[in-house]
């Protein structure tokens, strides 16, 4: 198996922890007792979603850092700073859930913005010129964004 194939396989398998909690939360909201009944391993569904999302966004920030280190131009400095901003905002999302329900919704919005920002940042580097990888990133970001929008709408409906 090539590294490109492994990257694609792991990328799409990485959607499962986004989609499964989203499905369970939608099912609980539509057919159950609401999001409070959407437990995953005994944990509140939105918290599980946020935790995984924050970890993946931090990981992607690290990949952005690695891409920037391969370049010596001035944009590399901004990319490295942005990668740190992604990681810090993902960490903040893990803390925001303890403040108030509306801040939990805000944390999902912030994570969504992070994924869209990551895609934009990658579009500015050479990564967007790698056709197969870029197509995969677009699809993955589409599905991740859709899952975030679903979770946001489910949480807003319960406020």
Predicted regions: what is each one?
Residues 1-70:
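Selected alpha-helical membrane-embedding segments in polytopic membrane proteins
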Residues 123-159:
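Terminal transmembrane helical module of multi-pass membrane proteins
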Residues 64-96:
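Helix-adjacent hinge/juxtasegments
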